[in-house]
C-alpha cells in the first residue's frame, strides 16, 4: 500500500489522483473517474469532489491501494 501525504484536513478525490500520479493533469480526473473503478474505504466512488480524510483507503484499479495520511 502506498502512502499519500496531505498537509490539509482533507483532499478532493480529483486532486488526490493527480498527487498519487494516477493522472497527469486535473482536467483528466472526470474521464478517469468514469472509466476506472475506484473505491474509498471499500465503497465505489466516482465523484471527483469527494473529500478524503486522514486514514482513508483509496483503491484505484490498475494502480493499487493508497492510504491518505495527514503530515
Where are these regions (language model features)?
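Generic structural motif recognizing short loop/turn segments at the entrances and edges of beta-strands
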Residues: 2, 34-36, 62-66
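A detector for short, charged/polar N-terminal pre-domain segments
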Residues: 1-11
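Short aromatic/hydrophobic contact patches that present stacked aromatics
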Residues: 3, 16, 57
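A basic, amphipathic helix-loop patch mediating RNA/tRNA/ribosome contacts
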Residues: 12-54
Amino acid at each position: 500500500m502506498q502512502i499519500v501525504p496531505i498537509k490539509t484536513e482533507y483532499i478532493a478525490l480529483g486532486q488526490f489522483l493527480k498527487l498519487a500520479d494516477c493522472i497527469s493533469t486535473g482536467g483528466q480526473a472526470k474521464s478517469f473517474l468514469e472509466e476506472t473503478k475506484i473505491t474509498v474505504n471499500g465503497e465505489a466512488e466516482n465523484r471527483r469532489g469527494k473529500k478524503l480524510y486522514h486514514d482513508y483507503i483509496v483503491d484505484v484499479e490498475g494502480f493499487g491501494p493508497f492510504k491518505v495520511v495527514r503530515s
